[in-house]
A protein has these predicted regions:
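Catalytic histidine-centered segment of alpha/beta-hydrolase-like enzymes
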Residues: 193-204
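Short beta-strand/loop motif that positions the catalytic acidic residue
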Residues: 155, 161-163, 167
Length: 204
């Protein structure tokens, strides 16, 4: 995945809302549902354009990246240097292209049926095969999460933030800070869920 700024994603969403949704809808009672990276894009959109949605559900939103046990500051310096030296379109460490291998056991899903459904769709459609992040995407993601926390107070609509207790991709600290800084956010923690809450077990 390559992007220079999450503003590009936000602009795309605004274009979609303006040219498709609002023109074809018979109601203006829009509810936003967004997951993970989409949750970051959704949060930024709510901060920049608060007039579009009446309420929102953010599922495991990316509001702080998780870099295992490595210091956040050092990681960011390495990423900036990689971009500076022209490696922005190279995969960041640990990232790779879609290889068509089923890795349910290592995935962020807890439902094999739901995982397999998405996996087969991804295998069949090349446009679904976005996978590993580049250095540029990682840098853009860090910048986006900082922006989201800084402007959280601009989100005034009711937001349900669903937090996964066993998330290996997203650091929940960012979600906690956002929930406190935004004006009307309810945080619901799913203690035993992995990152993809909607792909968890039926009991969750």
């Amino acid at each position: 995945v390559y992007i220079q700024s999450y503003k590009q994603y936000v602009d795309d969403l605004k274009c979609f809302m303006d040219k498709i949704v609002t023109r074809r809808s018979t109601s203006d009672n829009y509810i936003l549902f967004a997951h993970s990276m989409g949750g970051a894009i959704g949060a930024m959109f709510l901060e920049m354009y608060p007039q579009y949605f009446k309420r929102a559900v953010l599922s495991s939103p990316l509001m702080k990246m998780k870099f295992k046990n490595l210091p956040y500051g050092i990681i960011y310096v390495v990423i900036k240097l990689a971009v500076l030296f022209g490696l922005e379109k190279e995969y960041a460490p640990g990232q790779y292209a879609f290889d068509g291998i089923n890795i349910f056991e290592k995935s962020s899903s807890m439902s094999r049926k739901r995982y397999n459904y998405m996996f087969e769709a991804r295998k069949c459609h090349r446009s679904f095969q976005t996978y590993g992040g580049t250095y540029a995407w990682t840098k853009a993601s860090v910048m986006a999460t900082r922006y989201i926390i800084r402007h959280a107070k601009n989100v005034k609509i009711p937001v349900l933030l669903c937090q996964a207790g066993c998330d290996s991709l997203v650091d929940s600290k960012g979600q906690n800070i956002f929930s406190k800084k935004s004006q009307n956010t309810t945080l619901k923690r799913f203690t035993y869920s992995k990152h993809e809450i909607f792909n968890a077990t039926g009991s969750i």
